[in-house]
UniProtKB/Swiss-Prot annotation:
Tissue-by-tissue expression: Leaves. Not present in stems and roots.
Localization in the cell: Plastid, Chloroplast thylakoid membrane
Gene designation per UniProt: PSBY
Name recorded for this polypeptide: Photosystem II reaction center proteins PsbY, chloroplastic
UniProt membrane topology term: Multi-pass membrane protein
Length: 199
């Protein structure tokens, strides 16, 4: 990149440097653009040919910058963007920051689920039929999950291959609520099955 910049500046030197003469080419005493010295760019008066002064205008600087940017290898720019993204990915804690306020809510939901779940397990132990029906329903649900369509399996494998775990974070947030709903549905479903058997 430095070589490209030096080449561009060498081309611009012949067009933009002015001769040291006392003649003024403009009738206005004030120049239209502020002249900029080349000394910050590493060019000094000793390196310039005799009779040239190191004054360059803003359009010439802009042309040099745009010419340099235009000749940079695109793969180099893509590599720099990838490096920046990789560095940002290792230090990005936004997902964790989003989970921190949700952790107390999840704890509260789990606390509220625990006692009814223990009561349900005790009832199911006392009633063997309910326990068998519960096993049957859970087996049916498990078999339904195992017989998922290949498209859904392919999509889940694609998600698993990616490094983006936002879906998992959202699932962790929603999973207790889904469990609570299923838990509340289970007892009425068991009651309905018992009524159907007794009739």
């Amino acid at each position: 990149m430095a070589a490209t910049m030096a080449t561009t500046m060498a081309v611009l030197n012949t067009k933009c440097l002015t001769l040291n003469t006392n003649k003024t080419t403009s009738t206005s005493p004030k120049p239209t653009s502020k002249p900029i010295s080349l000394s910050p760019l590493g060019l000094s008066n000793s390196k310039l040919p005799m009779g040239l002064s190191p004054i360059i205008t803003a359009p010439a600087i802009a042309g040099a910058v745009f010419a340099t940017l235009g000749s940079v290898d695109p793969a180099f720019a893509v590599q720099q963007l990838a490096d920046i993204a990789a560095e940002a990915g290792t230090s990005d804690n936004r997902g964790l920051a989003l989970l921190l306020p949700i952790i107390p809510a999840l704890g509260w939901v789990l606390f509220n689920i625990l006692q009814p779940a223990l009561n349900q397990i005790n009832k199911m132990r006392n009633e063997k039929k309910a326990f068998i029906v519960g096993l049957g329903l859970s087996g049916l649900a498990t078999s339904g999950l195992l017989l998922a369509t290949p498209e859904a399996q392919a999509a889940s494998e694609e998600i698993a291959r990616g490094s983006d775990n936002r879906g998992t974070l959202l699932l962790l947030v929603v999973l207790p609520a889904i469990g609570w709903v299923l838990f509340n549905i289970l007892q009425p479903a068991l009651n309905q099955l018992n009524k159907m058997r007794s009739q």
